[in-house]
């Protein structure tokens, strides 16, 4: 089966969906996702989304991001992220995202590890869910965007140094999708780890496909642990992340002797390392405690309803019980190398979100910068594609001959592998 579109978007997280929404409405767009539409890490995000409070906050926010990333960040990418944060948050508000607000109507901000001030917008403790639900509603209002769920990208179609679309499997059938532009927003690779905060099916598919075609990759060795994941010895795979905002609102990390052993609001790598050092002292009890018992029950229930209930279901009550926590894989800072417009080293192939790497995070992402990265660079990517397709007179679809040539090469390659076997 062959389908033809102007733009193919692979991934239903914030990067893919936000980009699709900002592409011109006269473009014919296909968005596919490996599982269901809502099955993405963006939907799981709890703490919030960072934003510069105003232009005076730029230097501080830039420094916080650089410091968290151990100054291995790409400075241009960091400056872009920070300077374009507020206007993209406003776009989310315009879409209808119901961020928590103060009595005067202004945004209510929280603080997380590595931030020098309160600059994280949120919706209770399910920010990702509320953002994504809003974006999905806007997505379904767009007649020019077609969505196919449970559709797995297995390869891209390539001719010379240009991407011509993708090859997918849907309901057991192979589909060739011809597209002028292809966007890989396939998420991270947490599903490869035994202990992770990610969905198990997030296995770095987009990065693997890029590697196969010698598309440039950057900082793939930069992987992040989240310090506070609920310790459940019988749980394998996706675990319950206890948001950094719990510490931002006063939670403290304590060892088994009930002693505070680390500044709970240090960057994630620092806190994770400190926890692992504590765990080495008692390998039979591989956890430390997150202490929220000094906080008011009603505050905890109202500010963190999802986490309060999730912990209660497991027999822990935040206002009276110490919560056992340990680090788990959370995020990949590296990925497909892109510029500030999402362009990869292969023409007409773009990448965004956790699958991509601008270098904005350095070797350790600052808390709540991931959702922001998705929308800032997603918006820039959309505008770049809009401009490219307009300037080139709507470009041209890959020719039948180009696609046939690629498929012949693919058949020959697989046949050679079979002979070798």
Predicted segments with their positions:
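Glycine-rich loop(s) and the adjacent beta-strand/alpha-helix scaffold that form part
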Residues: 181-234, 371-375
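Conserved N-terminal glycine-rich FAD pyrophosphate-binding loop of Rossmann-like flavoproteins
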Residues: 35-66, 70, 237-238
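Glycine- and aromatic-enriched mobile tails/lids
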Residues: 1-5, 36-38, 44-51, 91, ...
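An anion/pyrophosphate-binding glycine-rich loop and adjacent beta-alpha core
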Residues: 209, 215-316, 384, 390
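A glycine-rich dinucleotide-binding beta-alpha-beta segment and adjacent secondary-structure elements
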Residues: 148-149, 154-163, 167-169, 303-357, ...
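N-terminal Rossmann-like FAD-binding beta1-loop-alpha1 element of flavoenzymes
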Residues: 7-31
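Conserved redox-cofactor binding core of oxidoreductases
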Residues: 94-174, 185, 229-233, 253
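Short beta-strand to alpha-helix junction loop
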Residues: 75-86, 119-137, 148, 197-204, ...
């Amino acid at each position: 089966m062959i389908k033809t579109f102007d733009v193919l978007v692979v991934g239903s997280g914030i990067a893919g969906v936000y980009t699709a929404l900002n592409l011109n409405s006269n473009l014919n767009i296909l968005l596919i996702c490996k599982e269901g539409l809502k099955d993405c890490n963006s939907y799981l995000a709890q703490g919030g989304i960072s934003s510069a409070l105003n232009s005076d906050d730029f230097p501080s926010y830039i420094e916080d991001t650089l410091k968290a990333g151990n100054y291995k960040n790409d400075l241009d990418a960091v400056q872009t992220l920070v300077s374009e944060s507020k206007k993209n948050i406003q776009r989310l508000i315009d879409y209808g995202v119901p961020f928590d607000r103060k009595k005067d109507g202004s945004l209510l901000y929280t603080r997380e590890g590595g931030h020098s001030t309160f600059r994280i917008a949120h919706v209770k403790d399910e920010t990702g869910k509320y953002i994504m639900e809003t974006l999905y509603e806007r997505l379904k209002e767009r007649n020019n965007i077609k969505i196919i769920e449970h559709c797995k990208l297995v390869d891209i179609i390539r001719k010379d140094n240009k991407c011509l679309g993708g090859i997918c499997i849907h309901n057991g059938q192979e589909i060739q999708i011809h597209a002028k532009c292809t966007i890989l927003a396939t998420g991270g690779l947490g599903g490869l780890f035994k202990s992770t905060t990610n969905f198990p099916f997030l296995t770095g598919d987009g990065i693997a496909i890029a590697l196969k075609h010698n598309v440039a990759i950057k900082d793939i060795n930069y992987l992040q642990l989240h310090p506070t994941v609920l310790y459940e010895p019988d749980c394998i795979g996706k675990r319950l992340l206890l948001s950094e905002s719990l510490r931002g609102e006063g939670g403290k990390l304590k060892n088994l002797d009930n002693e505070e052993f680390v500044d709970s609001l240090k960057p994630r790598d620092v806190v994770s390392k400190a926890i692992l050092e504590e765990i080495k002292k008692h390998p039979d009890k591989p956890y430390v405690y997150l202490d929220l018992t000094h906080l008011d029950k009603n505050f905890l229930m109202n500010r963190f309803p999802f986490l309060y209930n999730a912990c209660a279901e497991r027999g822990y009550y935040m206002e009276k019980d110490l919560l056992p926590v340990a680090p788990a894989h959370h995020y990949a800072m590296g990925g497909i190398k892109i510029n500030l417009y999402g362009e990869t080293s292969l023409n007409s192939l773009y990448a965004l979100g956790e699958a991509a790497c601008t270098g904005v995070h350095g070797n350790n992402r600052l808390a709540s910068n991931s959702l922001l990265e998705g929308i800032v660079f997603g918006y820039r990517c959309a505008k770049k594609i809009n401009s490219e397709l307009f300037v080139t007179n709507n470009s041209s679809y890959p020719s039948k001959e180009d696609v046939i040539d690629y498929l012949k090469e693919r058949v020959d390659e697989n046949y050679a592998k079979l002979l070798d076997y």
